[in-house]
Protein backbone atom coordinates (compact mmCIF):
# COMPACT_ATOMS: atom_id res chain seq x y z
CA UNK A 1 0.00 0.00 0.00
CA UNK A 2 1.26 3.49 -0.80
CA UNK A 3 1.14 5.69 2.31
CA UNK A 4 2.35 9.21 3.04
CA UNK A 5 4.46 10.77 5.77
CA UNK A 6 4.15 14.53 6.23
CA UNK A 7 7.05 16.35 7.85
CA UNK A 8 9.17 19.50 7.80
CA UNK A 9 11.63 19.76 4.92
CA UNK A 10 14.71 19.49 7.16
CA UNK A 11 13.44 16.23 8.70
CA UNK A 12 12.38 14.83 5.33
CA UNK A 13 15.83 15.49 3.87
CA UNK A 14 17.50 13.93 6.93
CA UNK A 15 15.20 10.91 6.59
CA UNK A 16 16.12 10.51 2.92
CA UNK A 17 19.87 10.94 3.49
CA UNK A 18 19.95 8.56 6.46
CA UNK A 19 17.35 6.17 4.98
CA UNK A 20 15.41 6.08 8.22
CA UNK A 21 12.25 7.44 9.79
CA UNK A 22 11.47 8.51 13.35
CA UNK A 23 9.41 6.25 15.60
CA UNK A 24 6.96 8.03 17.89
CA UNK A 25 6.39 6.90 21.43
CA UNK A 26 2.77 6.59 22.57
CA UNK A 27 3.29 9.27 25.21
CA UNK A 28 4.64 11.69 22.59
CA UNK A 29 1.69 11.54 20.16
CA UNK A 30 -0.33 14.72 19.65
CA UNK A 31 -3.70 13.33 20.75
CA UNK A 32 -3.91 13.64 24.56
CA UNK A 33 -6.42 10.77 24.59
CA UNK A 34 -4.15 8.40 22.65
CA UNK A 35 -4.43 4.84 23.94
CA UNK A 36 -7.47 5.87 25.96
CA UNK A 37 -10.06 4.78 23.43
CA UNK A 38 -11.79 2.59 25.97
CA UNK A 39 -14.02 3.07 28.97
CA UNK A 40 -11.99 2.04 32.00
CA UNK A 41 -14.87 1.73 34.46
CA UNK A 42 -14.60 -2.10 34.48
CA UNK A 43 -12.00 -3.01 37.15
CA UNK A 44 -10.63 -6.17 35.51
CA UNK A 45 -10.33 -4.38 32.18
CA UNK A 46 -8.62 -1.42 33.87
CA UNK A 47 -6.02 -3.77 35.40
CA UNK A 48 -5.43 -5.52 32.09
CA UNK A 49 -5.25 -2.14 30.36
CA UNK A 50 -2.49 -1.00 32.73
CA UNK A 51 -0.52 -4.14 31.92
CA UNK A 52 -1.03 -3.48 28.21
CA UNK A 53 0.09 0.12 28.65
CA UNK A 54 3.35 -1.17 30.15
CA UNK A 55 3.78 -3.54 27.17
CA UNK A 56 3.18 -0.63 24.80
CA UNK A 57 6.42 0.94 26.06
CA UNK A 58 8.25 -1.81 24.17
CA UNK A 59 7.06 -0.55 20.80
CA UNK A 60 6.46 2.68 18.96
CA UNK A 61 4.30 3.99 16.15
CA UNK A 62 4.96 5.49 12.75
CA UNK A 63 1.88 7.35 11.55
CA UNK A 64 1.08 7.69 7.86
CA UNK A 65 -1.86 8.98 5.86
CA UNK A 66 -3.51 7.40 2.85
CA UNK A 67 -3.75 10.90 1.32
CA UNK A 68 -0.91 13.09 0.09
CA UNK A 69 -3.01 16.12 -0.78
CA UNK A 70 -5.03 16.91 2.34
CA UNK A 71 -4.68 20.65 3.18
CA UNK A 72 -5.23 20.03 6.90
CA UNK A 73 -2.47 17.43 6.94
CA UNK A 74 -0.14 19.85 5.16
CA UNK A 75 -1.00 22.52 7.73
CA UNK A 76 -0.67 20.31 10.81
CA UNK A 77 2.18 17.96 9.88
CA UNK A 78 3.76 19.41 6.74
CA UNK A 79 5.29 22.46 8.45
CA UNK A 80 2.35 24.74 7.58
CA UNK A 81 2.45 23.83 3.87
CA UNK A 82 6.24 24.37 3.63
CA UNK A 83 7.30 20.79 4.36
CA UNK A 84 7.46 17.60 2.38
CA UNK A 85 5.35 14.49 2.04
CA UNK A 86 7.25 11.25 1.55
CA UNK A 87 5.48 8.36 -0.17
CA UNK A 88 6.25 4.83 0.99
CA UNK A 89 5.21 1.42 -0.22
CA UNK A 90 4.58 -0.79 2.79
CA UNK A 91 3.27 -4.34 2.66
CA UNK A 92 -0.34 -4.49 3.83
CA UNK A 93 0.52 -7.03 6.53
CA UNK A 94 2.58 -4.37 8.34
CA UNK A 95 -0.07 -1.65 8.17
CA UNK A 96 -2.66 -1.22 10.89
CA UNK A 97 -5.77 0.77 10.03
CA UNK A 98 -6.77 3.43 12.54
CA UNK A 99 -10.38 3.14 13.68
CA UNK A 100 -12.26 6.27 14.70
CA UNK A 101 -14.98 6.31 17.36
CA UNK A 102 -17.31 9.10 18.53
CA UNK A 103 -16.90 8.02 22.17
CA UNK A 104 -14.82 5.70 24.29
CA UNK A 105 -15.36 2.01 23.64
CA UNK A 106 -16.97 0.11 26.50
CA UNK A 107 -15.72 -3.45 26.91
CA UNK A 108 -18.62 -5.85 27.30
CA UNK A 109 -16.59 -8.92 28.16
CA UNK A 110 -14.51 -10.07 31.07
CA UNK A 111 -11.05 -9.81 29.51
CA UNK A 112 -9.55 -12.38 31.86
CA UNK A 113 -12.18 -15.06 31.18
CA UNK A 114 -12.58 -14.55 27.46
CA UNK A 115 -9.01 -13.73 26.38
CA UNK A 116 -6.82 -14.67 29.33
CA UNK A 117 -5.99 -11.00 29.80
CA UNK A 118 -5.02 -8.27 27.39
CA UNK A 119 -3.82 -9.99 24.20
CA UNK A 120 -1.41 -8.54 21.66
CA UNK A 121 -4.30 -8.02 19.22
CA UNK A 122 -6.22 -6.02 21.80
CA UNK A 123 -3.15 -3.87 22.55
CA UNK A 124 -2.72 -3.21 18.81
CA UNK A 125 -6.41 -2.29 18.52
CA UNK A 126 -6.04 0.16 21.40
CA UNK A 127 -2.96 1.64 19.74
CA UNK A 128 -4.95 2.14 16.55
CA UNK A 129 -8.10 3.70 17.99
CA UNK A 130 -8.68 7.45 17.94
CA UNK A 131 -11.46 9.92 18.55
CA UNK A 132 -13.57 10.59 15.44
CA UNK A 133 -12.39 14.22 15.31
CA UNK A 134 -9.09 12.94 13.88
CA UNK A 135 -10.76 11.09 10.98
CA UNK A 136 -9.59 13.71 8.46
CA UNK A 137 -6.08 12.27 8.87
CA UNK A 138 -7.11 9.03 7.14
CA UNK A 139 -4.36 7.46 9.22
CA UNK A 140 -2.67 4.10 9.11
CA UNK A 141 0.07 3.03 11.47
CA UNK A 142 3.08 0.80 11.51
CA UNK A 143 3.93 -0.54 14.95
CA UNK A 144 7.62 -1.27 15.42
CA UNK A 145 9.72 -2.58 18.32
CA UNK A 146 11.83 -0.01 20.13
CA UNK A 147 15.49 -0.84 19.96
CA UNK A 148 18.39 1.45 20.79
CA UNK A 149 17.91 5.21 21.00
CA UNK A 150 19.79 7.40 18.57
CA UNK A 151 22.39 9.75 20.17
CA UNK A 152 19.75 12.47 19.71
CA UNK A 153 17.50 10.60 22.15
CA UNK A 154 14.98 9.47 19.52
CA UNK A 155 14.14 6.08 18.05
CA UNK A 156 14.40 5.43 14.31
CA UNK A 157 13.84 2.55 11.93
CA UNK A 158 15.48 1.99 8.55
CA UNK A 159 13.61 2.20 5.25
CA UNK A 160 14.99 -1.21 4.36
CA UNK A 161 12.86 -4.32 4.42
CA UNK A 162 9.18 -3.62 4.90
CA UNK A 163 9.22 0.05 3.93
CA UNK A 164 10.33 1.42 0.56
CA UNK A 165 10.60 5.14 -0.17
CA UNK A 166 8.96 5.73 -3.56
CA UNK A 167 8.31 9.44 -3.80
Regions found by a protein language model. Give the residues of each.
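Partner-binding and oligomerization surfaces adjacent to conserved cores of proteins
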Residues: 1-167
